[in-house]
Structure formats: C-alpha cells, structure tokens
From Swiss-Prot:
One of its GO terms (molecular function) is 3-dehydroquinate dehydratase activity. Keywords: Amino-acid biosynthesis, Aromatic amino acid biosynthesis, Lyase. Pfam families: DHquinase_II. SUPFAM superfamilies: Type II 3-dehydroquinate dehydratase (SSF52304). It catalyses: 3-dehydroquinate = 3-dehydroshikimate + H2O. This is 3-dehydroquinate dehydratase. The keyword Lipid biosynthesis does not apply. It comes from Dinoroseobacter shibae (strain DSM 16493 / NCIMB 14021 / DFL 12).
Amino acid sequence: MHITILNGPNLNLLGTRQPEVYGATTLADIEHMCQRKAQALGLEIEFNQTNHEGVLIDQIHAARSESDGLIINAGAYTHTSVALMDAVASVSLPTVEVHLSNIHARESFRHTSFLSPVALGLICGFGATGYVMALDGIWAHLTAADSARP
C-alpha cells in the first residue's frame, strides 16, 4: 500500500517557526518518523511539502492514481481553501487531516476546517506524533477494508 503525505505552507519552517506552538521538531524529523512507522506497517510513503495551493491540488490529483490513501496537513489553507476540499473530495481517497497544534484551542478562525467534511478523520494537538497516529489510522482503515472484501 502507498500513502501520500502532503504538507502545506510554512511547514518547511518547523523547528524554528513558533516553537511554543509547533514544537522543535523539524519537517525532516517528521518525515523520518513517518518513514520508520511506514516501514513497520509495510507501507510505502511519499512525503511532500509546498507553500503553493495549486501545487497541493496537483499533488492530491496525482495521488489518485498513485496512492491508496492521503494524509494532509494543509496548514492555513485548512481554514480557507474550498479548492483543496474539492480536490480531496474529487479523488475519493481515504484522507486523514493532521495538525500539530489543537486547532480548536487556538484563534476562532482556526476552528473551521474545509477539509474535515471530506476527510476520514482528523488528528490535531499531538505534535509530530499526530503523523504517526495518522499512519496507524489509515493503515487500520485500509486493512479493514481489504479484509471485508470477499
């Protein structure tokens, strides 16, 4: 099974950007954590980051033919992008939305997610561990779906 993990704007600055909110873990550290977890689960992953909404949409579209599932931390686009929501909905892949911080405990504008209505699940507030939790969750979902098939 192949999982695409997408990261949106400003996540390339993890480790130095607002460590009191996002922690000291870098995106490279998170990718390494995900690689280790994926290997343990027998998954292949593709891990990407971009600061551009259109690139995220293109990557979601590409995942349609390359992946069995999608994990996305869309950063601030979570709260603003109908286009990302439409892209996720259009590819019909099980999708887990991830946020390092608890978006519901922050500013009120962060309480709205355009992705949650089209996602299988949402993990927020657990820092970098949320990505590992997302891999566990999507693996469990996919293997349950496989075992339910005749």
